[in-house]
């Protein structure tokens, strides 16, 4: 298991933008991680105060960070950055609210040089909350 210290070593993100709490499973090309969503998240102050819902773009960011942990934990990529290059086929199926535990899966399906394509999904209680195809560029 990759704990929060290893996540922080791999990713440059910090509060309030660090959206991965723990890695549950990891293999060469796939990772499963979680984010505990609490009412204390700063984005709930404005989205929406009377009906707090995690913004979909932040769910996708959490998925991107999940993929980033896997890629940046590899010896050859330590100290590098991963940048979003695109998103495709993004779908939001279920609202994510305070108290939810977001289980995020990212599977690398294609690599070409410094570009990688990832199939990603986020689930709450075994139900699909969001999914999409993410494209990344690995930079210096």
Curated annotation (Swiss-Prot):
Keywords: Cytoplasm, Lipid A biosynthesis, Lipid biosynthesis, Lipid metabolism, Lyase. Coiled coil: none annotated. Its EC number is 4.2.1.59. Its main location: cytoplasm. It is an enzyme of class 4 (lyase). The keyword Transcription regulation does not apply. It catalyses: a (3R)-hydroxyacyl-[ACP] = a (2E)-enoyl-[ACP] + H2O. The active site is at 47. GO terms for cellular component: cytoplasm; membrane. One of its GO terms (biological process) is lipid A biosynthetic process. CDD domains: FabZ. Gene3D superfamilies: Hotdog Thioesterase. Disulfide bonds: none annotated. The keyword Lipid metabolism applies. It is found in: Cytoplasm. InterPro entries: FabA_FabZ (IPR013114), FabZ (IPR010084), HotDog_dom_sf (IPR029069). GO terms for molecular function: (3R)-hydroxyacyl-[acyl-carrier-protein] dehydratase activity. Involved in unsaturated fatty acids biosynthesis. Catalyzes the dehydration of short chain beta-hydroxyacyl-ACPs and long chain saturated and unsaturated beta-hydroxyacyl-ACPs. NCBIfam families: fabZ, PRK00006.1. Belongs to the thioester dehydratase family. FabZ subfamily. This is 3-hydroxyacyl-[acyl-carrier-protein] dehydratase FabZ. It comes from Streptococcus gordonii (strain Challis / ATCC 35105 / BCRC 15272 / CH1 / DL1 / V288). The lineage of its organism: Bacteria, Bacillati, Bacillota, Bacilli, Lactobacillales.
